[in-house]
Amino acid sequence: MKYVVVLYDGMADYPVPALDRKTPMMCAKKPNMDMLASKAEVGLIRTVAEGLKPGSDVANMSVMGFDPMKYYTGRSPLEAASIGIDMKSTDVSLRTNLVTLSEDDLPYEEKTIEDYCADDISTEEAEILIKFIDEKLGTDEFKFYPGVSYRHCLIWDNGTIDLGKMTPPHDITGKVITEHLSTAENAQPLIELMKKSYDLLKDHPVNIARKAAGKRPANSIWLWGEGKRPALSPFEEIYGIKGAVVSAVDLIKGIGGCAKMEVAEVEGATGYIDTNFEGKANAALDLLERNDLVYIHFEAPDECGHRNEPENKVRAIEMIDERVLPILFKGLEKFDDYKIMILPDHPTPIVTRTHASDPVPYLIYHKNNEISGVDTINEETAKATGNFVEHGPSIMKHFLED
């Protein structure tokens, strides 16, 4: 038996005015997903427990079968693990976004966050900037590490997680940052690093070139997602099978790595609609040759939600359907039996541009046990089935049951 999870990050949504008050799932042409849904168990699942923030960290841990109430220590430590940082028990890791702040004469605290990802800056440009920041601001206490695109890492030696509210930048796009900077005393050294980064980055040659090319500058770091070293139990130890992960983003690769799952590196995997869809599908099939389960994560729908791009979100769903699922179907033909689970981790509604905690649609298809499902899967048809998984982390055990 082989198992495949296809995770469409942030795919679920609310009705979108620009889409005639339909959701992207309703608008997308997705014949392959709908074909599975017609022969599968379909329902809703609550991936984010009450009291937890609806982040991709918590939600993906749930889908992968790890209870965040037991295992979650923060977002950035998982990303740090992915890029090979060996954290000490006394270290604190913080996500370090490269963002675009308004270029005006106002004090730093009064600037507006124009883009949480600096126009989806390339990994190559970002590495130059993060290494420059580490050269100028790094100390024995603070060390910056480059990651992928706009997503990077700060390790704080003997740091604290008692930092007040360190707001995710994608939650406040278009807003003045004054009320979103932590006022906690322990956070002030971090706020100072952010302020100093603006002065260092605003006239950096990389940003001068970006502006000349019509792109937004990556003119500040933004620190959030703090946490201590994670301690996940190995996936195989819990579930008795070998698992693997395919993703463009460090967070998901970090969860997989911490759980002792095999993690693929796919050239051209970007985390946006320009990602190497075929490469990720083929990497998943390669992993299935020596693993029992593969978890394929696609970031693009989530990014489009954050960026208020309804047409691109629809297209992201369609591209996975066109360019990933057919490859998986063909590659799975040789196995006597297999199961496929498709779902988002959480909604990323276009109208709010940030994550939500609402239950999300899921489907579980079993090759040798096809059942009557729904003609098309979306938020409404999944709800109409009456199937509901209240405890998100239980979905993995359910998926693996015969």
Regions found by a protein language model. Give the residues of each.
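Feature captures the catalytic ectodomains and active-site-proximal regions of enzymes
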Residues: 1-402
